Amino acid sequence: MKLSLSPPPYADAPVVVLISGLGGSGSYWLPQLAVLEQEYQVVCYDQRGTGNNPDTLAEDYSIAQMAAELHQALVAAGIERYAVVGHALGALVGMQLALDYPASVTVLVSVNGWLRINAHTRRCFQVREQLLHSGGAQAWVEAQPLFLYPADWMAARAPRLEAEDALALAHFQGKNNLLRRLNALKRADFSRHADRIRCPVQIICASDDLLVPTACSSELHAALPDSQKMVMRYGGHACNVTDPETFNALLLNGLASLLHHREAACKELL
């Protein structure tokens, strides 16, 4: 699997791996790259079955497989310890990495994530699936911004959204791959295993997220042994895109604090 690695800003700089949501594209994190690359070596990638990592996914494709193939690609690139920043589905992959490779994951940041899919989120995806089956890729792509962005943000950026729609349609991951990735997301359930995640976790959510209620982040916060929760008042599901200034400040402060916390804890053990 192809990865995109930025040059380390200094020797032995911490590594931060960015995992996008259902869309799977590493370019989702473009508003974060410049600020993160000043402090960290940053890894982005298109998830298997999307973008520059094309493949035909199996019907039983799972979050555990997503985590395993990413970890293997990181190890092949010489990266054995890393922090993870995951959005929605990417946050699920991050939790799976923290469970399966605890010696590798130093810190986890969950952005609009959850323990198991909420009834409201499931309903949203059911509507989107019906659009996909009845109207094809174009209907899926055109509806997607409604679940990602606040209405006023969209209204002020109509030409941008039209361009994004055209790009998303041109690089659509395919109906079968999309549904298999979506089914993996819907099957994932960390409610019985979250207490085994020992790395420090920063939880970021947006109070106006149409797709994932903030209660999901509250449940996640309550279930994790070592977590902190930050709520953005504005931004929608894709709050890192719509309000990058607020999001980036939270992310940078959180990473610095949690990595220091992890380093101090490791020294105490020594």
Curated annotation (Swiss-Prot):
Pfam families, per the entry: Abhydrolase_1
Keywords: Hydrolase
Catalysed reactions, as listed in the record: carbamate + 2 H(+) = NH4(+) + CO2
Hydrolase in keyword set: yes
Protein name, UniProt field: Putative carbamate hydrolase RutD
Annotated family: Belongs to the AB hydrolase superfamily. Hydrolase RutD family.
Function: Involved in pyrimidine catabolism. May facilitate the hydrolysis of carbamate, a reaction that can also occur spontaneously.
Organism: Escherichia coli (strain SMS-3-5 / SECEC)
UniProt xrefs under NCBIfam families: RutD
Its EC number(s): 3.5.1.-
GO biological-process terms attached to the record: nitrogen utilization; uracil catabolic process
Lineage: Bacteria, Pseudomonadati, Pseudomonadota, Gammaproteobacteria, Enterobacterales
Gene name of the encoded protein: rutD
GO molecular-function term, one example from the UniProt record: hydrolase activity, acting on carbon-nitrogen (but not peptide) bonds, in linear amides
Keyword Hydrolase: yes
Family annotation (InterPro entries): AB_hydrolase_1, AB_hydrolase_fold, AB_hydrolase_sf, Pyrimidine_utilisation_RutD
